[in-house]
Amino acid sequence: DEQARLAGMLHDIGKYSVAFQSRLQGSSCTVDHSTAGAQEAFRLRQPEAAFAIAGHHSGLPDGGSSTDRSERPTLFGRLKKAVEPCETWSREVQPSLSSAKRPAQIAPDNLSEAFYTRMLYSCLVDADFLDTEAFMREEPAPRGGYAPLSDLFQKLRQHIAPWLNPSNALNRKRCEILQRCLDAGRERPAGLYTLTVPTGGGKTVSSLAFALAHAVAHNLSRVIYVIPYTSIIDQTADTFRSILGDENVLEHHSGADYSASDDAVDAALYRKSLATENWDAPVIVTTAVQFFESLYSNRPSRCRKLHNIANSVVIFDEAQTLPVHSLLPCVEAIGQLVQSYRVTAVLCTATQPALQPLFAQLAPRLSMQELCPDTSS
């Protein structure tokens, strides 16, 4: 995306100022180096990039209003702020505006523009963190290097192969649900789905089967499994680890601890700790709180992962437990991800909540379809 490229090129132009260069030589003066880039991006009529640049250290700011004074921390306030002269940046940095436009799939409404700004912000802050990490370390951090999703799909197929010749009625029903999910994953287009499976119907593995088959068929990047309670997350994560391998499954919630038990650095734990920062793992198991609060956060550390939610399959387990008081922003977020960011979302439960009217109202371009009709009994 050219707006992301523009944000990357302009975000640190304030460091060209004499004051900041003095700081590099040991001066203790404090220099605001992000406002200059935000002002330049806004001058170039790129407000989303201006928001991202302004907040890449301190947090995504409120927009405020054109009447805000220069001392206000809002974007409009900072656009009026006097900055240290730094014009020499233009000798080395020459951003191109020929294609720096909002992507066509982003609707021209406030919510869509806000989500696009957050995604742009996520790209910028994650790239900035990674670039700083690479500069400060003497060797590359142990990131990436995961098995491709196609390999994980084969691991799953090997795991379920003995199940496909069921010996009793219950197992035949489970097998039917599993096979339907595999077929749907390969054949269905990206979109919004429900998976209504009775208790004991093998919902966890069947939903994983759909997700991996779908991700491979549509060249998606990862599978994200969103669970409402930490009390049930460990069991799901253990199931996935037993099938796909511990190294390929990232469990991220308040109770997940990746600190080493002694002074020695555990390479596997450290790798997972790094992955919690930006969700670059192939399979992620997280909580609804972590997922939705990150989508609506303004802090760089929480927002780093957002761009890695794009181009994914997201399974919402026990969707009927989405809190009523937060239902509107949750549904709006799911709608944005599916409509604009190549996310396939599955609402997975034994008893579907009545979300169809909300999605029809908030995301009218989406149609909600059941993956396994006639399996409720």
Task: Indicate residue ranges for each PLM-predicted region.
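Inter-Walker segment of RecA-like/P-loop motor cores
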Residues: G245-Y296
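Walker A/P-loop
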Residues: R188-A211
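SF2 helicase catalytic motif II
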Residues: I284, A288-F292, P300-S340, A345
